[in-house]
Amino acid sequence: MKVLVINCGSSSLKYQLIDMSNEESLAQGLVERIGITGSILTQKVEGKDKYVVETPLKDHQDAIELVLKCLVDENHGVISSMDEISAVGHRVVHGGEKYATSVVINEEVIKALDEFTKLAPLHNPPNIIGINACKALMPKTPMVAVFDTAFHQTMPEKAFMYALPYELYTEDHVRRYGFHGTSHKYVAGEMAKLMNKDISDLKIVTCHIGNGVSITAVDGGKSVDTTMGFTPLDGIIMGSRSGSIDPAIVTYLVKEKGYSIDEVNDILNKKSGVLGISGIGTDFRDIRSAVENDNDPRALLTMDIFGYQVKKQIGAYAAVMGGVDAIVFTAGIGEHAPEIRSRALTNMEFLGIEVDLEKNESHNIGDGMEISKETSKVKVVVIPTNEELMIAKETLELVK
């Protein structure tokens, strides 16, 4: 069976076609600038030259139609007919409290996703548009929604509730939801395989550290706490997001400094985090370069804050679970920034964590590598995430 995985943004679309008989990616691509000038598709197939198509795309339906054409293209495609696509798995950011697992998409599901839009106004609308576009072009192909929030629905009330008036939860659904669930679930499962143990017997801290950052306590294969909250703004410092701050700062900026709510929202989401502290940008390679070449004090401070916050969260989740057996680092920074891993892991011997600094210094770990010492009671491993494969697996499970 071949599963097409779709991830729609507001003006972009990522896709991957996966052969589930061997879990190999047949083709992957990115469509950019949908609905604006300069629309472009870039498709990569193993053993073939990169295929680039520049053509106007007025909406996501146009984009998905182009994707399907490229997949069956005589010279650049990988399948002879769309009939070879057994199912489509859609990444959906927010499933609210209704969906604790992936679900086959029908009209009831689409209606529910629409209701969750108020919880994820930036992300769910393009997800829904992508689903509707696929349904129009592939009406007989089963579709599955795989939610970023679903994995975290196992969190207990004491972890997901905010200390706000209770009615804000019961009436307005204000609570911690958590995100990156597909990634956390995937790397926790891979960690259990590497340790040759049943995941139900393990306490794992998974650190998804990219432009967005979230850390999760996975106890017995279930998420019991996570750093992102009601929105993906909460938690650890991120590329341009602040992470957790004193909520009174918002009041101060509005009342004392005269900012509008929209301006504060823009500051917290787009002008803070790594960008805000360093003044350089969101790309961690630029931060590293500023430290190594210029000894830039703000770049160094950015690294120190980042590592400190990750360390603090690992310690907190070890306390929550009553210990920790393994720690996983994944996503762009987690996989390729040894400076952050070393800052997060040094002086943690009291928890049984002993990091091998020489192994850790590898910038390009590739398919995964243990960076803890042989004597370490806690296994620390870098595992590249594969959210697309996880989405495809969950899709196949529901439609086979």
Curated annotation (Swiss-Prot):
One of its GO terms (biological process) is acetyl-CoA biosynthetic process. Its main location: cytoplasm. Substrate binds at R91. Mg(2+) binds at N7, E387. Mg(2+). Can also accept Mn(2+). GO terms for cellular component: cytoplasm. PROSITE patterns: ACETATE_KINASE_1, ACETATE_KINASE_2. PANTHER family: ACETATE KINASE, ACETATE KINASE-RELATED. Belongs to the acetokinase family. Homodimer. NCBIfam families: ackA. This is Acetate kinase. It comes from Clostridium beijerinckii (strain ATCC 51743 / NCIMB 8052) (Clostridium acetobutylicum). The lineage of its organism: Bacteria, Bacillati, Bacillota, Clostridia, Eubacteriales.
